[in-house]
Amino acid sequence: MDEDETTYPEALRRLLIETPAAIWQLDDESAQCNNCGGPFTWFRRRHHCRWCGKLFCYNCCNSFAKLPVSSVSVDPTEDLIPQDMFIRDPDFLANDNDDDNDSQDSSWINVRVCVNCRQQLSELKELDLPYPITTCLNDDTTTRSNNQVIQSSCGNNLQRIEEPDDFVECPVCYAPLSSFKTLSERESHVANCLSNNSSSPRNMTEFLKHARRYISMQLSETSPCLGQECIICFEEFAAGDRVARIEYCLCIFHLKCYRDWLSTGAAGCPVHAATLHLS
């Protein structure tokens, strides 16, 4: 079933407009579906999710959702989104009454999304979150530098985990990491920020903007998190598990556990944001 944008709460519509487009994953950057892991072949073709920008097979990317043009991921080799894909919906836009924000009167487009993004859109619609959101596999703090090693955490202990993307800004103080010359300097900065500021972010407004953000990934057989416990369900992580990595603190939880946690109204990570609840 396609996501019906006419039921998006006003706050979510505004957040979708404010969310920057995800980076487009090039065809040669993935030989398999980012969801089921099936290899791409002549018969199993590549399909891009227009919200997270990642590559999927047809079975994992056959839903559609209406999104603002500003948040649609596009092929960098294409100059523009085809005009015949634009949708002007007066009934949908009629609920946006903020005259001070011209971006509310924006073109919306019906695009293909993956199963994970469709699920996240459904959850966000139900929660009516007042904070910026991100896609299930990407966020506006990542770049297309592949096979980088970044610092992550399971529970309270920092671990090293290979991820396809690297932060371009510190998830704690939001300082640009491009100012650091080496990867080790970036890792050291993030580790220090997590150690010194995990309980007192730069300001609460900025914290709330980032507290719920996460990316979804599947654990491999070599993941350093294997055997450690998800502190929500107390079950050990196993190869093949779908997990959520929190942007702010880099903690990792089972994806379903974290989504269930968010549905209670929690502001974010159970470890670092357990005392914050939505009003």
UniProtKB/Swiss-Prot annotation:
The modification Phosphoserine is found at S200. It catalyses: S-ubiquitinyl-[E2 ubiquitin-conjugating enzyme]-L-cysteine + [acceptor protein]-L-lysine = [E2 ubiquitin-conjugating enzyme]-L-cysteine + N(6)-ubiquitinyl-[acceptor protein]-L-lysine. Pathway: Protein modification; protein ubiquitination. The keyword Metal-binding applies. GO terms for biological process: cytoplasm protein quality control by the ubiquitin-proteasome system; protein ubiquitination. A zinc finger (FYVE-type) spans 27-122. Its main location: cytoplasm. Pfam families: FYVE, zf-RING_2. One of its GO terms (molecular function) is phosphatidylinositol-3-phosphate binding. A zinc finger (RING-type) spans 230-273. One of its GO terms (cellular component) is late endosome. Keywords: Cytoplasm, Endosome, Membrane, Metal-binding, Nucleus, Phosphoprotein, Transferase, Ubl conjugation pathway, Vacuole, Zinc, Zinc-finger. Zn(2+) 2 binds at C49, C52, C114, C117. It is found in: Cytoplasm; Nucleus; Endosome membrane; Vacuole membrane. CDD domains: mRING-CH-C4HC2H_ZNRF (cd16489). Zn(2+) 1 binds at C33, C36, C57, C60. Its EC number is 2.3.2.27. InterPro entries: FYVE-type_Zinc_Finger, Znf_FYVE, Znf_FYVE-rel, Znf_FYVE_PHD, Znf_RING, Znf_RING/FYVE/PHD. It is a peripheral membrane protein. PANTHER family: ARRESTIN DOMAIN-CONTAINING PROTEIN D, ZINC FINGER FYVE DOMAIN-CONTAINING PROTEIN 21. Functions as an E3 ubiquitin-protein ligase. Binds phospholipid vesicles containing phosphatidylinositol 3-phosphate. This is Putative E3 ubiquitin-protein ligase C36B7.05c. It comes from Schizosaccharomyces pombe (strain 972 / ATCC 24843) (Fission yeast).
